[in-house]
């Protein structure tokens, strides 16, 4: 919403005897010098039956929450809507995020309304008419000191999701939680959280923070990892060979890879970006099962394939499937199962064939794999040669398979024209001719049909 329309609404509220304040993340982001999103207004001193007609002067009004009076205002010519709400009075009536009785209360004071917020950095408001900052819980001071501090310890645990929100806020805004905040988060049960709400916070942590490792480290410290993600907890203390991983155990390496991956995905759509970050989180989940001392060195043979099962379990816990039509789960498991392939292909004793690239492209996006493998290579202390990933991607691009394997030239309809009936035999013939195509022996439909005819002749 334009600042002019915002001020006009605030003036109209004032003329009716109320006060409108910008609240929440918008004010926090402004104070941090970031571009704010999702403008929210809280209106004091006006009941809902007077507020709605006032808002209708400015555009279309949709009711989002009847019981606690939240209105979405869509003004003609404005790209974004604005949420306008009465201050809320909440009382806990049961477990979970739905176990609340919430009522709009226009008589609530600004301080009491801010008290229901989770952290002090989100309890700051601004008057759009005077630009006065209203900050009853010293959120600005905490922003300046990069502190994450709970507003009201007595009610913070009413919604256990706030524990995960704390981790993602720490990551996004580079905050350090106070000792009181950490102790409080450890004490709050998390078993009432549905996977969808957990994933919502994890996605923000992974995709919106420059250094997601900050939030993941806090999640470990406050017991989130232990209680929600045992697959990740198993990485803590899992040793690695110091020559290849001087940074420490698998957990430390994973945090470094997560940050490296985050630095390489700003040009990706949401689905592939989420797959890249989840791949970073999951890529070495097979190491706890496979790590052993072999010939005096710490090794993890087969950890790529061994990581698929725990990665699947973790994705199940988060209920991650597809995002915006992109199969995130398939992409993540492909990255886990094949994350060493770029380096292995480059170091192979004999040159890796074009067919090997084409076959690998059936299982995973090779551009995403190369991008991730580079993050994995750089996710260590020390200096390592990571040029194999560039070589790998150049080969994939030269073959035109960086995002997918080539489509089959010969289809079932072609075989029907040759008199082959649908069934297992047709499937076997299609597989054999496609294998030849992957190996570069077939480049056109005609060449493919000639190969099929030879196969049919050899059967007689």
PLM region descriptions:
Residues 1-460:
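Catalytic cores of the polymerase beta-like nucleotidyltransferase superfamily
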């Amino acid at each position: 919403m334009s600042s002019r329309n915002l001020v006009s609404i605030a003036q109209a509220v004032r003329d009716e005897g109320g006060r409108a304040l910008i609240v929440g993340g918008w004010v926090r982001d402004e104070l941090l010098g970031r571009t704010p999103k999702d403008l929210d207004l809280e209106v004091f001193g006006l009941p809902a039956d007077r507020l709605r007609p006032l808002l209708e002067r400015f555009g279309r009004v949709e009711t989002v929450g009847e019981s606690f009076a939240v209105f979405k205002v869509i003004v003609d010519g404005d790209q974004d809507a604005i949420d306008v709400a009465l201050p809320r009075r909440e009382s806990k009536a049961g477990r979970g995020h739905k176990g609340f009785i919430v009522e709009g209360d226009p008589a609530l004071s600004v301080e009491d309304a801010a008290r229901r917020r989770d952290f002090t950095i989100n309890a700051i408001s601004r008057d759009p008419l005077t630009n006065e900052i209203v900050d009853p819980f010293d959120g600005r001071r905490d922003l300046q000191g990069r502190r994450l501090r709970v507003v009201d310890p007595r009610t913070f645990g009413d919604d256990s999701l706030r524990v995960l929100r704390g981790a993602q806020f720490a990551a996004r805004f580079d905050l350090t939680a106070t000792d009181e905040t950490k102790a409080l988060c450890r004490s709050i049960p998390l078993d009432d959280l549905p996977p969808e709400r957990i994933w919502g916070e994890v996605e923000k942590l992974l995709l919106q923070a420059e250094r997601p490792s900050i939030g993941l480290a806090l999640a470990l410290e406050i017991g989130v990892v232990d209680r929600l993600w045992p697959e990740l907890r198993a990485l803590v203390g899992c040793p690695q060979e110091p020559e290849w991983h001087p940074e420490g155990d698998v957990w430390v390496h994973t945090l470094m890879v997560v940050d490296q991956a985050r630095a390489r995905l700003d040009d990706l759509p949401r689905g592939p970006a989420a797959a890249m970050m989840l791949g970073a989180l999951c890529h070495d989940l097979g190491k706890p099962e496979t790590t052993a001392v072999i010939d005096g060195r710490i090794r993890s043979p087969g950890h790529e394939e061994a990581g698929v099962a725990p990665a699947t379990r973790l994705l199940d816990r988060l209920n991650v499937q597809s995002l915006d039509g992109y199969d995130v789960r398939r992409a993540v498991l492909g990255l886990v199962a094949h994350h060493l392939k770029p380096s292995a292909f480059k170091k192979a004793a004999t040159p890796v064939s074009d067919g090997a690239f084409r076959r690998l492209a059936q299982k995973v996006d090779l551009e995403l794999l190369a991008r991730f493998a580079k993050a994995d290579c750089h996710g260590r202390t020390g200096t390592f040669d990571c040029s194999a990933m560039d070589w790998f991607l150049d080969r994939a691009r030269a073959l035109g398979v960086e995002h997918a394997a080539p489509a089959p030239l010969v289809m079932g309809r072609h075989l029907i024209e040759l008199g082959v009936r649908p069934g297992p035999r047709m499937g076997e013939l299609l597989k054999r001719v496609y294998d030849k195509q992957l190996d570069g022996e077939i480049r056109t439909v005609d060449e493919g049909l000639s190969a099929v005819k030879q196969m049919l002749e050899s059967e007689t």
